[in-house]
């Protein structure tokens, strides 16, 4: 019997297929097969890198509600992207802080764009005022293939927000007067809604630190609407607040004194009969105040204790808009008039007038000017008893030529103390504008604020009524002009100078000034410029 050995060679199928691929031979065919080589996606193996950042590193004057845009080189895994949305704990993989990560800004849920390469962030509220804000990206951030950042990223110093402040209620509020003490603290007074419905009004006083931090705000409790207010700081550290209130068939003067901690020391309301034609209020160096008066008087003087000293009758046709007292207690008055003044005939409509009277009510001199249409002085400022500036509005030249009471131009004119005109400047826009406030600097330069419905010289129009601020030298040369605002209406009503020449502007806005929080109706704004017109 023969025995045959049965050798069985077992070759795995994959090995045979691999051999087939290596030889490149197909049975019955002499051609070589081309086999594609699959390469890994190197993009998914790359570490995520931050390639662009908005606002940029070291950016300044960033709006307080600005969005943050982070752009990366590769798509990111959304599951690794988190922010602290519920509290101020620095807990997410993306963190924003203004105090070295002791706590972080609450953020809205993030938004992804550009195939997950771009992250859009917005704050739930607003950023802190005039602070550097750093951004931290932790190493837990990954791309779609699970590859992390090489290391944690922290911007330094980050971006810096604006100084601008905004406060208000759901009703209509307005800043009217502002003052700065020797330490740089800012005091702000004006009108606010006294109840939720907004139908009751009251006077308020607020104190800000130089950094913009709101130290306190007090509602005076007079429960009256006010049309003008002034602030004066005593050497003893007390703040004098004076306001003029006009309501139907009734007007009143409000006197109050506050300590620097916000405590009310003294207050008094002096009720007057009738309603005066016009508004305005000023305080002389002795603390006495002057206001428009009801018939038969035009101006009333009230002592610092609230006693009525005298009433002065000037002309029955005066509508007073502004008053200012010099260091000798002489009084300047401006506004509009519809009849002759001191035998000076008006040109038509209502003309602008400027009067100077002594502290005893005796008239020194008067000036009138205007067109066939309506115009008015709205603001006054005195410089060292040597010059007086009058600001207001006049009809645009085209409107005056056609006899059409349409658009208006803002103006400012300088007189010397004897009533001689020195120079005039007219702000020209396509639509209406008015000057509303003026202030001299100690160096004799003049600041003029107002509002415009269009773009002034080389300026951008944000929308509706924008605020503007201009600075002139003593000869009337325009040094700079700035236009600012929101898409809604703004009007500046008060100016003050800081200890280093800063310029503080207050008034009202119906939008978000530099990204600040909007409460509704009209809000109070407070913004700061340096002496060269750079907004802070």
Annotate each PLM feature:
Residues 26-28:
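C-terminal motif of bacterial Sec signal peptides marking the signal peptidase cleavage site
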Residues 159-536:
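A sequence-level/structural motif corresponding to short, flexible coil/turn segments enriched
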Residues 2-15:
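Bacterial N-terminal signal peptides that target proteins for export
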Residues 31-161:
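Acidic, low-complexity Ser/Thr/Gly/Pro-rich repeat segments typical of extracellular/periplasmic
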Residues 15-18, 23:
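Ala/Thr-enriched low-complexity intrinsically disordered regions
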């Amino acid at each position: 019997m023969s025995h045959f050995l049965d050798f069985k060679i077992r070759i795995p199928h994959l090995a045979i297929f691999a051999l087939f691929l290596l030889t490149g031979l197909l049975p019955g065919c002499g051609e070589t097969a081309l086999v594609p080589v699959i390469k890994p996606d190197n993009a998914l193996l790359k570490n995520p890198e931050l390639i662009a950042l908005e606002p940029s590193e070291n950016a300044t004057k960033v709006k307080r509600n600005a969005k943050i845009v982070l752009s990366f080189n590769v798509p990111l895994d959304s599951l690794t992207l988190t922010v602290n949305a519920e509290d101020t704990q620095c807990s997410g993989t993306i963190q924003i802080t203004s105090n070295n990560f002791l706590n972080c800004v609450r953020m809205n849920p993030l938004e992804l764009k550009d195939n997950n390469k771009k992250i859009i962030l917005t704050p739930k509220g607003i950023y802190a005022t005039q602070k550097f804000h750093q951004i931290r990206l932790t190493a837990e951030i990954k791309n779609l293939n699970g590859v992390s950042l090489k290391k944690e990223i922290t911007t330094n110093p980050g971006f810096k927000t604006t100084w601008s402040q905004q406060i208000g209620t759901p009703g209509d509020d307005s800043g009217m007067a502002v003052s700065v003490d020797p330490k740089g603290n800012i005091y702000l007074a004006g009108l606010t809604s006294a109840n939720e419905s907004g139908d009751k009004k009251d006077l308020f006083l607020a104190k800000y630190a130089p950094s913009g931090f709101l130290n306190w705000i007090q509602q005076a409790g007079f429960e009256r609407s006010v049309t003008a207010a002034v602030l004066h700081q005593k050497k003893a550290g007390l703040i004098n607040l004076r306001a003029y209130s006009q309501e139907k068939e009734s007007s009143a003067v409000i006197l109050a004194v506050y300590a620097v901690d916000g405590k009310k020391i003294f207050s008094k309301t002096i009720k007057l009969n009738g309603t005066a034609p016009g508004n305005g209020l000023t305080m002389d160096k002795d603390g006495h105040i002057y206001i428009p008066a009801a018939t038969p008087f035009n101006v009333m003087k009230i002592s610092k204790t609230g006693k009525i000293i005298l009433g002065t009758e000037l002309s029955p046709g005066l509508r007073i808009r502004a008053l200012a007292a010099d260091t000798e207690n002489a009084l300047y008055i401006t506004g509009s008039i519809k009849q002759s003044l001191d035998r000076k005939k008006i040109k038509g409509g209502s003309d602008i007038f400027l009067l100077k009277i002594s502290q005893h009510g005796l008239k020194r001199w008067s000036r009138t000017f205007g067109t066939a249409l309506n115009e008015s002085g709205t603001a006054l400022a005195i410089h060292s008893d040597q010059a007086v500036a009058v600001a207001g509005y006049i009809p645009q030249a085209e409107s005056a030529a056609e006899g059409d009471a349409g658009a208006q131009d803002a103006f400012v004119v300088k007189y010397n103390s004897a009533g001689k005109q020195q120079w005039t400047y007219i702000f020209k826009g396509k639509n209406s504008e008015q000057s509303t406030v003026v202030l001299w600097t100690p160096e004799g330069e003049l600041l003029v604020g107002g509002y415009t419905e269009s773009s002034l010289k080389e300026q951008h129009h944000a929308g509706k009524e924008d605020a503007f601020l201009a600075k002139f030298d003593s000869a009337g040369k325009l040094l700079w002009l700035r236009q600012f605002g929101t898409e809604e209406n703004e009007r500046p009503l008060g100016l003050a100078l800081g200890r280093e020449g800063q310029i503080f502007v207050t008034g009202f806005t119906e939008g978000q000034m530099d990204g600040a929080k909007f409460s509704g109706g009209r809000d109070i704004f407070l913004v700061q410029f340096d002496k060269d017109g750079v907004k802070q």
